[in-house]
């Protein structure tokens, strides 16, 4: 049986791995075994992060919609509730795009949502200019002074 020589294939395989690991730090870009291990981890991260990116964008859209709807006097939750009641089918991606690029159209949608909501007195009112809450002033350290007096009296006795 003829001898199989694999030097060319082995060198090509290693070269491809090291080329793909270019840009990694330290041994991970220079040593084949470390580079191969890092590439396997990188593939796992890239797969997972492609899934994670969808949730990240959804959270970003919700933040943008919430900020714009509060500027128009309605919370995000009430806006979505009102749009569903009005049977307006606009997804969060488009709402966020409208909130950023076309404020007048977004304000019109907020008005549609407000009109379709039932008059609910228990719902919190959101003002267009929400004032930051003032923190309560701390009380002076009267307790510490009162606690020290008996100790001082006992020492005097």
From Swiss-Prot:
Keyword Magnesium: no
Compositionally skewed regions (Low complexity) per UniProt: 122-134
Ranges of compositional bias, category Basic residues: 135-147
GO molecular function, one term: structural constituent of ribosome
Signal peptide: none
UniProt keywords, alphabetically: Ribonucleoprotein, Ribosomal protein, RNA-binding, rRNA-binding
UniProt xrefs under Gene3D superfamilies: 6.10.160.10, Ribosomal protein L20
Pfam families associated with the record: Ribosomal_L20
Single GO cellular component term: ribosome
Record GO biological process: ribosomal large subunit assembly; translation
Annotated segments matching region Disordered: 121-157
Highest rank taxon of the organism: Bacteria
Function: Binds directly to 23S ribosomal RNA and is necessary for the in vitro assembly process of the 50S ribosomal subunit. It is not involved in the protein synthesizing functions of that subunit.
Family stated for the protein in its record: Belongs to the bacterial ribosomal protein bL20 family.
Name the UniProt record assigns to this protein: Large ribosomal subunit protein bL20
Name of the gene encoding the protein in the UniProt record: rplT
């Amino acid at each position: 049986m003829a001898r199989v020589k694999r030097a060319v294939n082995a060198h090509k395989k290693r070269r491809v791995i090291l080329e793909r690991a270019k840009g990694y730090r330290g041994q991970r870009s220079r040593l084949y075994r470390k580079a191969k291990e890092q590439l396997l981890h990188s593939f796992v991260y890239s797969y997972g992060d492609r899934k994670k990116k969808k949730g990240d964008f959804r959270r970003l859209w919700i933040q943008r919609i919430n900020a714009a709807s509060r500027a128009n006097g309605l919370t995000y939750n009430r806006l979505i509730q009102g749009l569903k009641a009005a049977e307006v089918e606009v997804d969060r991606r488009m709402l966020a795009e409208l909130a950023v690029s076309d404020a007048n159209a977004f304000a019109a949608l907020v008005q549609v949502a407000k009109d379709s909501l039932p008059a609910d007195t228990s719902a919190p009112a959101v003002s267009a200019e929400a004032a930051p809450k003032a923190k309560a002033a701390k009380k002076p350290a009267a307790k510490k002074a009162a606690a020290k007096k008996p100790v001082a009296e006992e020492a005097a006795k």
